[in-house]
Amino acid sequence: MQVLVRDNNVDQAMKALKKKLQREGVFREMKLRNFYEKPSEKRAREKAEAIRRARKLARKRAQREAGIVTAKK
């Protein structure tokens, strides 16, 4: 991963690098790989994440539909 350093502004480059790494999920991956995760624990975690994503999607859909209904009135 590369980040351009402009005008010797290292702080800004570090900020940009951190943002890119965060978006790519590198920090999360490092945290997960820090210790061994049993396959059963991995399945449980992935299932919980899927449920969380589904709830979040349903909540967004409900808000969008409610916004459309109130906008028509």
From Swiss-Prot:
Disulfide bonds: none annotated. Keywords: Ribonucleoprotein, Ribosomal protein. InterPro entries: Ribosomal_bS21 (IPR001911), Ribosomal_bS21_sf (IPR038380). One of its GO terms (cellular component) is ribonucleoprotein complex. GO terms for molecular function: structural constituent of ribosome. It comes from the Bacteria. Transmembrane segments: none annotated. GO terms for biological process: translation. Coiled coil: none annotated. Belongs to the bacterial ribosomal protein bS21 family. HAMAP family: Ribosomal_bS21. This is Small ribosomal subunit protein bS21. The gene is rpsU.
